[in-house]
Amino acid sequence: MANVEAQTGELIEKLITVNRVAKVVKGGRIFSFTALTVVGDGKGKVGFGYGKAREVPAAIQKAMEKARRNMVTVQLKGDTLQHPVKGRHSGSQVYMQPASEGTGIIAGGAMRAVLEVSGVHNVLSKAYGSTNPINVVRATIKALNGMKSPEQVAAKRGLRVDEILG
């Protein structure tokens, strides 16, 4: 679907997909719309929202509000990832690895939008299995959330940071 981008204050909002759904009742079908959006500050905070309403603008507005409420902080290393990560949700699997300066965001569809709003500028990624946008977004955010900085790993293992990094 169209990738609509808006900036409100310091937050970057992206519309990933809008879908028309139908509820079948005795008198026929009742149509409504769903919207999937991601919101981030470009500095490591990202959230997604899924809204549903009878009209498209209302669905988008609901999704944006949910995305702002469900933001998580991601530990970035400059403008790339700390280390390679995998994420899984339902039938979707994602793999992301840090890339050198100037690589850009090598990602498709819904994963690209999540990485752009979270502040990642150099990454190599691949989605496996189902490419359902909702599941890909959830898997991507789970993977980013599971990423740990060397300081966190060192503290957990009871070692110094230079011992972790080699």
UniProtKB/Swiss-Prot annotation:
Where does the UniProt annotation place the signal sequence? Answer: none
Q: Name one GO biological process term.
A: translation
Keyword Ribonucleoprotein attached:
yes
Q: Where are its TM segments located?
A: none
Q: Where is the S5 DRBM domain?
A: 11-74
Q: Which InterPro entries match?
A: Ribosomal_Su5_D2-typ_SF, Ribosomal_uS5, Ribosomal_uS5_bac-type, Ribosomal_uS5_C, Ribosomal_uS5_N, Ribosomal_uS5_N_CS, Ribsml_uS5_D2-typ_fold_subgr
Output a single Gene Ontology CC term carried by this record: small ribosomal subunit
Q: Which UniProt keywords apply?
A: Ribonucleoprotein, Ribosomal protein, RNA-binding, rRNA-binding
Tell me a Gene Ontology molecular-function term this record carries. rRNA binding
Q: What is known of its domains?
A: The N-terminal domain interacts with the head of the 30S subunit; the C-terminal domain interacts with the body and contacts protein S4. The interaction surface between S4 and S5 is involved in control of translational fidelity.
Q: How does it assemble?
A: Part of the 30S ribosomal subunit. Contacts proteins S4 and S8.
The family classification in the record reads: Belongs to the universal ribosomal protein uS5 family.
Under PANTHER family, the record lists:
S5 DRBM DOMAIN-CONTAINING PROTEIN
NCBIfam families, per database record: rpsE_bact
Report the protein's function.
With S4 and S12 plays an important role in translational accuracy.
Which protein is depicted? Small ribosomal subunit protein uS5
Q: List the source organism.
A: Idiomarina loihiensis (strain ATCC BAA-735 / DSM 15497 / L2-TR)
